[in-house]
């Protein structure tokens, strides 16, 4: 999806109910869209997932972050070849 190396958020991230988004469990080695293998997937505590996407390779404090809800997961790749971690 989106090649990201670092994700830093200075304040808490809230879901649509105003609750803090938390990574409560990790699912290992699943297949994503188009048969791409995702060795690490983090699921929100309430089971509502998001995909984090950005035009920036590194997201740091001060950069805009746009979240798009899609199919219950978010994935972060570690390089331009979309090797997910």
From Swiss-Prot:
Keyword vocabulary terms for this entry: Antimicrobial, Antioxidant, Fungicide, Protease inhibitor, Serine protease inhibitor
Keyword flag RNA-binding: no
Post-translational modifications reported in the UniProt record: The N-terminus is blocked.
Thermal behavior of activity: Stable for 7 days at room temperature and for 30 days at 4 degrees Celsius. Remains active after incubation at 100 degrees Celsius for 3 hours.
GO BP terms: defense response to fungus; killing of cells of another organism
Extent of the signal sequence: none
Molecular function per GO: antioxidant activity; serine-type endopeptidase inhibitor activity
Family of this protein: Belongs to the protease inhibitor I3 (leguminous Kunitz-type inhibitor) family.
Summary of the function given for this chain in its UniProt record: Inhibition of trypsin. Has anticarcinogenic activity, prevents transformation of DMBA-treated JB6 cells. Has antipromoter activity, prevents promotion by tetradecanoyl phorbal acetate (TPA) in JB6 cells. Prevents tertiary butyl hydroperoxide-induced mutagenesis. Protects AT base pairs and shows antimutagenesis activity in TA102 and TA104 S.typhimurium mutagenesis tests. Inhibits paw edema formation induced by phospholipase A2 in Swiss Wistar mice. Prevents the release of arachidonate, the parent compound for the synthesis of prostaglandins and prostacyclins.
Name assigned to this protein: Turmerin
Organism encoding this protein: Curcuma longa
Lineage: Eukaryota, Viridiplantae, Streptophyta, Embryophyta, Tracheophyta
